[in-house]
């Protein structure tokens, strides 16, 4: 403890502080407004004197409420490194010209309202209470909270932070036993903001309750830290604006109404509930979602698959495709009862995953036969059964195929190229006579009432097409009629088309059965 005589002569502001600090009222210097850089001794207090007061200058004990000071110009570094301070530090409209050094300190609470601060370094500090920076405060340097422990809430609301080439907030492994509010405090009247020049780095942080990141504007300096040690979108890379990588949030992560031009990193984070804006003007920033886990969406969150798929697609360009974010979204949507939406997400995931596999194949082996087979099989699975998630597509595909074939074989019939599929009939006198008298349509003439084939199976182009496509059902058309290869090109084309239609029919039927029975693995 330093003797009071060491601070002689005291400034008028220091004398007022010493004589009134034990009282229940806040000590106000001057008019209580934020002092300028050239403020006089009537509001000037040395940080070293404040340190002694906080640590127990016995002749002038503080009120149990702690240090409560307004309108002071505090000179020098407030150095509490490694100390045990049982007092709250509450400063309002104060200019703190030196750094606040709270490294490894134990304090009750830190509350800054409308202050100007050079920088705050509180790595591994212990706060039994809360940490508040509010009321249009300005921090000219970095706020360091690496490894700090906060027993209450963390509020950075109504604050401007200029990291001075460093991070705006550097808080890896921060532990908050309450909630964290960055930007707007939702439980008060009016709205507040957080404006930063520098990264908000909360990697591996743990927040026991809720985390609100709203009304935040984050810009990065021209030469951000970490641009050489990490890739642009890695850990502390040059393109990371907000990092909650591997963070744990016990309540809701509320991420909305922000202006962020670079990457938001949620890789490996885990939250109980999630609320954000998947689309819109404020949702243009890239997202790292690989490994991001959330148990549920807020009831007011937009869970439409179109919006959520756009959200997932906002990964940084240099980041390779990862299936986990799609599987996580589908899992949560399924638990919410949105099964069709979950299947839509998984179907898109499968399409993108297969496209990524084809890209890797092309990079290693070029666009050869193997790549072509991969592409062909992917297209068949995609459009026939939706990779197993939409087996009903096979029915629609079959209907379209049957309709197309029906139109073709009706044209073939009209051209006279459909003949009875029986050798004895083709050599019979009535059929030969029909081909001679009506060469433009012998089948239609031969099978009409009053002719030799009136009791033969009546031709139906629709049933004939269904007979070809559906392998498990026999409509009798293919047994009765067949295209002729000795007449017009339609007959020759129709004869070969039968085999293609049968092959496609078998493939579609097999895929539909596999999708319905789960043979096509979907998980």
Which residue stretches match the model-derived regions?
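Membrane-interfacial segments
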Residues: 412, 416-420, 517-521
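Long, positively charged binding patches that form subdomain-scale interaction surfaces
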Residues: 380-408
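Hydrophobic, well-ordered secondary-structure elements that form the walls
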Residues: 342, 408, 516
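N-terminal leader/targeting and pre-domain segments
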Residues: 1-377
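A sequence/structure-level signal for intrinsically flexible, low-complexity segments enriched in small
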Residues: 361-368, 394, 406, 410
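Pore-loop/selectivity-filter region of tetrameric P-loop cation channels
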Residues: 373-391, 415-504, 511
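C-terminal substrate/ligand-recognition segments
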Residues: 397-401, 405, 499-523
């Amino acid at each position: 403890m330093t003797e009071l005589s060491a601070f002689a002569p005291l400034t008028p502001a220091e004398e007022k502080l010493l004589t009134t600090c034990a009282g229940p009222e806040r000590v106000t210097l001057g008019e209580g407004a934020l002092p300028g850089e050239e403020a006089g001794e009537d509001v000037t207090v040395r940080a070293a004197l404040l340190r002694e007061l906080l640590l127990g200058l016995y002749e002038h004990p503080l009120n149990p409420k702690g240090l409560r000071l307004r309108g002071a110009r505090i000179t020098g570094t407030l150095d509490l490194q490694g100390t045990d301070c049982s007092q709250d530090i509450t400063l309002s409209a104060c200019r703190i010209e030196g750094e606040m050094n709270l490294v490894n300190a134990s304090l009750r609470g830190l509350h800054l309202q409308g202050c100007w601060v050079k920088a705050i370094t509180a790595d591994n500090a212990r706060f039994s209470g809360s940490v508040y920076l509010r009321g249009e405060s300005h921090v000219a340097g970095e706020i360091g909270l690496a490894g700090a422990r906060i027993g209450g809430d963390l509020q950075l609301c109504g604050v401007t932070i200029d990291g001075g080439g460093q991070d705006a907030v550097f808080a890896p492994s921060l532990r908050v036993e309450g909630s964290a509010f960055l930007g707007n405090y939702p439980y008060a009247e009016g709205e507040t903001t957080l404006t930063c020049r520098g990264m908000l780095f909360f990697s591996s942080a743990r927040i026991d309750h809720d985390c609100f990141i709203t009304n935040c504007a984050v810009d990065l300096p021209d030469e951000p830290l970490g641009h050489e040690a990490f890739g642009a979108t890695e850990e502390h890379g040059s393109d990371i604006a907000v990092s909650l990588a591997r963070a744990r949030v016990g309540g809701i992560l509320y991420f909305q109404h922000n202006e962020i031009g670079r990457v938001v990193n949620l890789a490996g984070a885990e939250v109980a509930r999630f609320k954000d804006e998947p689309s819109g003007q404020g949702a243009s920033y890239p997202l790292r979602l690989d490994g991001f886990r959330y148990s549920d969406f807020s009831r007011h969150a937009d869970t439409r698959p179109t919006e959520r798929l756009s959200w997932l697609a906002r990964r940084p360009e240099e980041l390779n495709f990862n299936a986990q974010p799609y599987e996580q979204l589908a899992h949560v949507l399924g638990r919410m009862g949105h099964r069709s939406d979950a299947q839509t997400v998984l179907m898109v995931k499968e399409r993108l995953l297969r496209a990524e596999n084809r890209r890797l194949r092309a990079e290693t082996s070029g666009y050869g036969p193997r790549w072509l087979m991969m592409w062909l099989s992917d297209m068949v699975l995609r459009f026939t059964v939706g990779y197993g998630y939409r087996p009903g597509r096979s029915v629609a595909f079959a209907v379209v195929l049957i309709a197309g074939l029906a139109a073709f074989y009706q044209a073939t019939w009209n051209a006279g190229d459909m003949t009875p599929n029986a050798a004895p009939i083709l050599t019979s006198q009535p059929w030969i006579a029909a081909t001679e008298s009506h060469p433009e349509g012998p089948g239609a003439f031969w099978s009409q009432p009053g002719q030799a084939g009136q009791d033969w199976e009546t031709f139906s182009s629709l049933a004939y097409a269904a007979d070809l496509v559906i392998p498990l059902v026999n409509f009798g058309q293919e047994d009765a009629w067949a295209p002729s290869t000795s007449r017009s090109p339609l007959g020759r084309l129709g004869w070969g088309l039968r085999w293609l239609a049968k092959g496609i029919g078998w493939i579609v039927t097999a895929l539909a059965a596999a999708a319905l029975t789960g043979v096509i693995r979907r998980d």
